Regions:
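Alpha-helical transmembrane bundle of multi-pass membrane proteins
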Residues: 1-216, 232, 239-545
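Short arginine-rich
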Residues: 219-226, 507
Length: 545
């Protein structure tokens, strides 16, 4: 029987074109995050920016703070948005995040002193963190199983697209007024202001009736039994959240008390603690493979390996953005087919080889790159190799896995905690890397190499061998029908409990089953209504193979 596990992603995305469009819209949050990651590295080396903030230009430690203060704000935003998204809904938390983001962006791009710059970047980062927490969760809950990995990978693709365009905007605006003493302040204010426009687009969405939204997304009439069942499932999910909190904490428990207890359970309940450790360790390891350290300080790095001249420097940096973006596309197309674990292992191997090469070249030619330019370009190429390998592996899996491994009742807060851990690690990396590059030079990349190796070993021994089965894709094409029986990975909730211990998933399953019975949702009837569609899909696939 021909396999189409994960569904060839292009066909799946075309079939679910409205969901794909909505996913692209929601992924603007990722574009904003990526844009800032890329734009700040170019702005830091612009002549007028250095003249405007002379203390910042001469102090590597202060540079680390101006970069990392954004990630500190993002950590706070990701942490607080867990309960906010549960309370206000995913959509309204996205809109709130964009308002906060816009305020920070305006302060940052109009900064007249370091205090304004720091405050603007912190507020801006808070909005970024809120978006980074809720967008992957929103996409994973919105998507049918067969294209879930592809849609959530769009978050990473949008990040890389933001990084790519930021480099080239920096490259273009650096010539406003010249690249020397006469350079205009617009050279760096314009790149910082550009990020306001995608945020304004994202903040203009309008509310529609839930059933009409489903009609548009699924492209079936309101009378379709599957659509009605999905609508009831959404209603069941709301009832499930309310009933779970009442059963666990009592009817009179305050929202603050419930939120505190749920965060506490992530560390005190054994099976939740194991899932939390896996989700948070993945975020921590990702940052210390070196990605954001490279993205934030690329111009300084390329200058240190002999690529002299501001234009050459920014060109080399711009290629990083292109490689990053193009290398993310295979993950969007094939991640559901490859599986998370295999992708992480292959990515760890590729990143380890690249980091070893960069570190060794720098150690050997550290003081002679000027007279050995080929060695500098070789190091540059291996940085591109690292970026490409990172992009198709942990860059995408990092956003997906935290949304997949937790029981429904606590998923929002767990994802918020995992993303907050990402930003804590990002903050530390952004803060210490400038000093590492100055003091231990090539040792910085040996440090990153160690974490690339740890990623491979940790994934091999600790990440479960699971990927979505073809049967599940055919049996449950609508996401909400699936949620009653399975976690977001496509692994039955009972099996997730076996992997991590505990029985909270099974308890959730029984609770959802009771609610479904109350609402009259009947999976057997839904299954019969799918038979003809499944036969048509199989005939199409067999004819194409």
């Amino acid at each position: 029987m021909p396999s189409h596990m994960g569904h060839p992603a292009i066909k799946g995305l075309v079939k679910e074109i409205r969901i794909f469009g909505l996913a692209c819209f929601a992924s603007i949050g990722g574009l904003l995050f990526g844009y800032d990651q890329g734009v700040i590295s170019g702005v830091l080396v612009m002549h007028n920016f250095a003249a405007h903030f002379p203390k910042l230009a001469s102090d590597a430690g202060l540079q680390g703070w101006v970069v990392s203060i954004m990630t500190l704000g993002a950590m706070c935003g990701a942490f607080i948005n867990g309960p906010i998204s549960d309370r206000l809904s995913r959509r309204w938390s996205i809109l709130l995040a964009n308002i906060i983001f816009l305020i920070g962006s305006v302060i940052q791009c109009s900064a007249q002193n370091l205090s304004m710059l720091f405050v603007g970047r912190f507020i801006f980062g808070t909005g970024i963190g809120m978006l980074a927490m809720v967008c992957p969760l929103y996409l994973s809950e919105l998507a049918p199983l067969n294209i879930r990995g592809a849609l959530v990978a769009l978050q990473q693709l949008s990040i890389t697209f933001g990084i790519m365009i930021s480099f080239w905007i920096n490259y273009g605006t650096q010539y406003i007024g010249g690249t020397g003493v006469g350079q205009s302040a617009a050279a760096w204010r314009i790149p910082l202001a550009v990020q306001c426009f995608p945020s304004l687009i994202l903040a203009t969405g309008r509310e529609e009736e839930a059933l009409q939204v489903l009609v548009k997304m699924r492209r079936v009439p309101e009378t379709d039994y599957r659509l009605r069942s999905e609508f009831l499932e959404i209603k069941a999910a709301r009832m499930f959240d309310k009933q779970t909190k009442i059963e666990k904490y009592g009817e009179n428990a305050s929202r603050v008390y419930v939120a505190v207890q749920e965060y506490k359970e992530l560390f005190t309940v054994s099976h939740l603690r194991k899932r939390t450790m896996v989700a948070c360790l993945l975020q921590f390891i990702q940052q210390f493979t070196g990605i954001n350290a490279i993205i934030y300080y690329e111009p300084q790095f390329f200058e240190s390996i002999g690529l002299s001249g501001n234009s050459v420097n920014l060109l080399a940096t711009g290629v990083v953005g292109i490689v990053f973006f193009l290398s993310t596309i295979p993950a969007v197309l094939y991640l559901d087919r490859w599986g998370r674990r295999k992708t992480l292992i292959y990515g760890a191997i590729g990143m380890s080889i690249a980091q070893l090469a960069v570190a060794t070249l720098w150690a050997v030619y550290q003081d002679t790159f000027i007279i050995h330019p080929s060695a500098g370009w070789a190091a540059c190429v291996f940085v591109w190799v690292y970026i490409g390998t990172f992009a198709f592996s942990i860059a995408c899996v990092n956003w997906i896995m935290p949304s997949e491994m937790f029981p429904p009742g606590i998923r929002g807060k767990a994802v918020g905690l995992a993303i907050a851990c990402n930003y804590i690690s990002n903050f530390v990396a952004a803060l210490v890397v400038p000093k590492m590059l100055k003091t231990i030079a090539s040792g910085t990349f040996y440090f990153f190499l160690v974490f690339c190796i740890i990623l491979g070993v940790w994934t091999y021994f600790c990440v479960p061998r699971r990927k979505v089965s073809e049967y599940l894709i055919l049996r449950f094409p609508f996401r909400s029908l699936l949620m009653s029986h399975f976690s977001l990975t496509g692994v039955p909730i009972e099996e997730m409990d076996k992997l991590f211990g505990g029985n909270e998933g099974e308890a959730d399953l029984r609770r959802i089953a009771d609610i479904r019975t109350q609402l009259g949702v009947d999976d057997d009837n839904v299954k019969e209504s799918f038979i003809e569609e499944i036969k048509e899909d199989n005939e199409h696939i067999e004819g194409a193979s």
